[in-house]
Every structure is written in C-alpha cells, then in structure tokens.
Amino acid sequence: LTPTDATEVGLEDYRGYAEHKPMPGEPEPDPERLAKRANDVLTHLNFGKSDEPLVVKVAISGTGVDGALKNLEADTNGWDFDNVVQQNRVAWENILGEFELEGGNKADKTMFYTSLYRTFVAPFLYQDVDGKYRGMDGKVHQAEDGLVNYSVYSMWDTFRAAHPLKTIIDKDRAIEHARDLLNKYQTGGVLPKWELHSDYTGEMVGHPAVSVIADIMVKHPEAFTAAEFDLALKAADETVNFNLDKTESWVPYQDAWNGDKRFTVMTRHNDYQEDVGFIPANTKWAPDSGDKPGYVEGLKVDKYDELVNESVSYGLENAYYDWCIAQIAKLAGNDQQYDRYMARSESFKNYFDYNPEQYGKLQDTKGNALGATGFMRPAYMNSGSKVWANNLKAECLDENMALSIPDGMDYNACKDRKALNESDVFWPYRAEHRGEDFTEGNTWQWTWFAPHNLNGLANVMGGERIDRTDFSLPEDVTEQGKAAFLANLNALFNADSNADTSQSHDMSGYIGQFVMGNEPDHHVPYLYNWTAEPWKTQEIVDQAMNEFYHPTHEGLIGNEDVGQMSAWYVMSALGFYQVTPGEASYTIGRPLFDKAVIPVADGKFTITSENNSQESIYVKSVTINGKQLSDNFSFAHSDLKDGGELHFVMTSDKSEAMKAL
C-alpha cells in the first residue's frame, strides 16, 4: 500500500462506541473514563476501488502488537481463502465426527451437531504462540509447566451444563480450565465469575468458578496433586469472603461503570449469610433514608453494601457454591473447612416461606388450585429480627392472588416499595431483571435452586425443616416432604405463564412458570426423578427439546449464553443430565436417538434406545453397563468415563413407564 491508500482516523468517527447508554438499573458511567475511551484510536483502511477480491490476514494478541505479529508469522494456513475455509471445515469435522448418531430425523441431527459445535466455541485460547499472555493483574506473563490461558468464561451460565459436558467429552480441556482458573486467582487475587479477556467484569451472581473447579476435581481427582487441592481451597475461601483490604489498589478492580469492582467481583453477600443466616433485602438501604426515602430500617454500612442486592438469588446460589467448596475441602483433607462450608450450604432453608394456607389460593388458568406450599422469599432485618419482605399491594390482587389492578392504578403503583413492607403481600409471579430480590426471574423459578440438597428442599416444602450438624450422610427426606416436593413441581409447570406483565427479557420459553430460556431453571425438569412420578421428567424434557430448539435462524430459545443453552440440549438429547455439578453423578431423561456414541476420557460411551420414536417418550426400563440405576435414576461418572453403555427401552404407554427407584 502507498500512503494514499490508507487513512487513519480517530475514534470520534465511531462516536456510538463512546456514547454508552446504561441498561435500566445500571449506574451511569464515569464521564472522565468514557472520555479516555473516546480518545483511543482505531485504524480505518481504505483500499480504493477494485474488481478483484482483497485477501487480508488479521492477527490479534492480548499482550501487544509484537505478540500479534508473532502470531501472524506463525500462521501456516496460506493465502488461498477457499483452502483456509476447507481447513476449518476439516478441523470441525474431526471434532464433531467423534460423535455418532443413529435414528432421529434430519432436524434433530442438525440441531444436535449445531448445539455441540456451540459448546466447543468457548472458553478459547488467549495467549500468544510464544506462551505469553495477559494475566488478571493486567501484566504480561509467560505460561509455564503446560499452563494454557483461556478467555470467555461465562460461568454463571456454563457451570450448569456446558462445563459438566466438557468433563465427559473433553476431559483434558476441562482439567486445563480448572488449572487456568486457579492461575487467574494467582495473578488476580480472586477467582473470576465472568472473565473476559483477562478482565474480571464482575457480571452475574455468586462464585460459579468454584463449581467448575469442584466438578472436574471430584470426577478426576487423579489428575490433580495435593498441592492443587490446597490451592483450590485457598482460592475459593478467599474469593467468597469479602475482604476490604484485599483489593484496595488493584488495577483489575477499576472500570468505567462501577469504578471499584469490589461492588461486583467480591461482594459482601456472604458476610451477612454467615453472620445472620440470610442476606437481608434491606442491606443496601441507608438507615438515615438518604438514598431511598422511607427505608428507615436500612442496614447500609458503607458504599460496598450498595450492591448487596438480589438477596434471594445470591443467597440460594451462594449456599450451593459453599457446598462446592466443601467438596474441594474434602479432597484437600481439610475437615474444618469442610464442616464450615457444609454448614453454610444449609442456609438456603432460611429463605423458604412455608405457608400452604396462603399459597394454596393460587390457581391455574382453569381455576384449579395449584397446590403450592411455599416459596423462596426475601426477608428484611428489622430491629435484629428476620421479617418476611412483601412485594405487592394487596389491593392489586383478587381473593385467589391473581392480578386485579384497581381503576386509577397501574402495575408500577402496585409494586412500588417506598417504605419497609409498605407492600402487604408477597406475590410469587412478580418478575425482576436485576437489582431487586431476584436475578432475571421470580420465585417460581428460583425456589428450585438447592441442587446440592434436594431432600432438604423437599423437607422445608413439607414444613419439616431439619437442621443438621452431621454431614457424613445425605439428609433423609420425610414422606410429607416427598409429597410437597411433587405438589410444588406440579404447581410450577401448571401455573399461568402470563401472570406478570413485567417479565424480564431473559425470561422466555415458558411451560407454566418454568422458564427454559434462562439458566436458573435448567435442572428443574429432571427433578421429577426425585418424586413418585418420574415419567414427568421425560414429558417435560421432550416438550422442551421439541418446542424450544429448531435448526432455523430463530430456532433457539432465550440467550445462547456461550454454549449453555446448547449444552442443555446436547445432554438432554443423549438422555442424561447432571443436576448437581460437583457431585459425580447423572440422572436420566428422554433420549432422542436410537443410538449415540460419544468420546469419553478412556474410550467410547454408547447410549442405545429400543423402540424409540416421537411417540415413545417414556422409559420402560434402563440399565447402565447392564446394571440397574441407583436412587433417583442416577448413575456415577465412573460408570461412563472408561466407556460403557446406557441402555433404554422406551414405550408410548405412560402406564408402562418406570416408577420411582
């Protein structure tokens, strides 16, 4: 190119980049930091007019221009564009070709392989050819001892199915991810929860990295050293417990919108959960009512309490993450930390409001009682005591708790909270995106997030809470708990899908109040395997696969979320799912294909289905390597990691479906 062939311009020609508009509820960005961004320079290249194709190679690096040049020089793909496309196609065929399918229709197979492809896209390699990478401290490091640096960990989404799937079909990479996350702790100081290009971001809820690490460690402990178990426990312990001094001057904890990322990366939620047993919903409100007129019972201590919000979602997820840390502590042989975090993991019980008289008023669209016994619910701390928090004015509901807004009012007036419990009813349909009591949903969806202790969840649903001190055995479930668990599941899937007109845009793909289009509910269809009616898991999973997944431009429900939505489909189509990441076991669903062969750690695992069809959705019998499955239709990771066979016999007759094991 000659000097006249290219023109460099400033970012002012791309003004929209600097004019960041915050989402509803998001704080306004700092003007000075945005001004700095606007002064950054991009390069605009004008190649003039030509009838010939222009072939350009672009190299990127997280370390700088020199790194990008080295990466470009190391490229051996050549300059034939069509040939490079073919090389890419062959590379993907080599990966996807490891998976063999028989049966099913063309659309099912297209959907399966497309979904499988999406699960392999991220996290992706984020280091130069010479091993240099940018760490979480903003500095350039040299990868040693086989370390591989990855980026794009959307872990609040992907800990649920995408990462567990990798432990099955791509074990070595799953191990690399765990080691990479531990290295990010070492270069940054805490584990990330949504890492992007060596930046913490602080996006979403809780501390999902501990789930990702625990899951691969419990499945393949032989791959890790005692020192790595100790490091994982240290990283988890320091990450989930707020430390005001730890991040005082850290570069990675500064950004344009939040300034100090202690607001979102290392929050104070767990301090309250451990001290008082739950996260008060009024933590962020100042006692002097300075920031929210009327909130005279606010608890706010300092600015770091401002984002102690979404108390129920944080409380439930943190209880599960504490359980994950306990599993790491067990591997590390640290009994004290195991007992501490197992005790903390029981705190989900403090959010459940058992009130069958009140919630028994809820009805389906035909006027039938739903049978709900209670919900996970926010609570205030008022004069040292826990008080349930309300979210709607009673005058906006009828006698069956259905929305009935009086003339002269609108929905916003019904839900406005200008004083502690000015609202006088807790309405389970009220949905929220962010910033209130729940994250991207309502209590219908969030009530089910206690995957680490489903028996304990069933017991509180039955009004029989059991406070444990001995964690050597799982909690026993009572008969009343079993009945209530089933009743509440049925209520979820039969509730009105359109009850709340303020639903978050992340809420889509409704079956009752179950939401397939967002992550918190992804395990819920499989919970019928813990009831006397396990065939309902097969019905719901089949319905979700057929209604919400299609190989078309608009065929995927919700947000793909870096492979999680697709990973749910892949595992469900194979016929099994992991309800509790961190526990090396799986439960069954409804297999979509007559035969599927997938790569596993040390061989091939085969799923076969006799009498399989679109109508034969019920499981008549099932074995793993010729043996009957365990309770709740489960089998262990050890049953598949060396290869083997999961064999189904299907039927279209619901009366022939297997009963509870």
PLM regions with names:
Residues 36-49, 626-643:
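Short, surface-exposed beta-strand/turn "edge" patches of beta-sheet domains
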Residues 60-63, 593, 614-616, 628, ...:
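Extracytoplasmic low-complexity repetitive segments enriched in small/polar residues
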Residues 601, 624-627:
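Short strand-turn-strand beta-turns centered on an Asx-Gly dipeptide
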Residues 610-612, 629-660:
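Beta-strand-rich ligand-recognition modules
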Residues 1-149, 226, 230-241, 651-661:
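Acidic/polar, glycine-enriched structural segments that form the non-catalytic walls/loops
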Residues 145-160, 168-169, 210, 223-346, ...:
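Active-site core of glycosidic bond-cleaving carbohydrate-active enzymes
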